[in-house]
Structure formats: structure tokens, C-alpha cells
Amino acid sequence: MSIRSGSAATLVHTVTRQDIEDFARVSEDHHPNHVDDEYMGRTSYGRVIAHGILLMGFMSAASSRMLLDAADDTPGTVVSYGYDRVRFVAPVFVGDEVTVDYEVVELDADTGKGRSNVTVKNQVGDTVAVATHLI
């Protein structure tokens, strides 16, 4: 793999009601925060919010995009060892366009292990989630 410090990818996705409903179905997380308009209408959020873990799925997709973009004929497999310091700092609503910026910030040439910074922002530039990805 031609992955090095500075390797990066960006993913842009508009969150739909169908995304949230599909994620609720697959994950079996049907908490009212994510699926009940009436319930959330009575809260300070005013409407349903996307699952934080759905945002992590977008983080993973950005990681995969970076890996595919950086791939060459060199043998080797980069895998995810998990995410540290994950924070969901603002809600994401139906119709929000999220941009995931993923960048490798450290990579050990001998072991191939490293870490990446991941930031998710909404369409107005507010940070909605952050994480450190261990690869």
C-alpha cells in the first residue's frame, strides 16, 4: 500500500430519512431519538437526529476510500484497529450534508500501523463528530 502520513480522503453525504430508518432496522436501534417525530418534536432538538454510529459508518467509508485511492501493487493489508476519542459534538438531522475529512497523521513504516484524524462537519461548517482512527 502506498499509504503514508498525509494520505487523505473526503466523503460527502446528505443524510436522508431512509438512511436513518435503514440504520435503525439493521442495528435494531429504534430509540425515539432516531425514529419518532412526535417524541423528538417535544424536545430541544425539535426533530429526529441521526445515530452517532451512522456517522461512524461514514468515517469508515472515508477510510476505505483513502485505502482504495492509495492502493498499488505492493502486497499488504491495512486493517482498522478501532476508533479512539470518538465524540458526537452536535446533532445531525435529516437533510444535513455531512463532509467527512479523513487524514493519516502518523504511520510506522516498519509495522504499517498508524493513526488518522477524522472530522465530520455539516453543511454550514459546524463540527458534528470527531475521532482518531487506529490503523
For the regions a protein language model found, what residue spans apply to each?
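Catalytic strand-loop segment that frames the active site of acyl-thioester-processing enzymes
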Residues: M1-A50, L68
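HotDog/MaoC-like acyl-thioester-processing domains
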Residues: M1-A8, F88-I135
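Hydrophobic small-molecule pocket/channel-lining residues, especially in calycin-type beta-barrels
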Residues: V12, M40, V78, T119, ...
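Hydrophobic beta-strand-centered segment that forms part of the acyl-chain substrate-binding groove
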Residues: R47, S60-D101
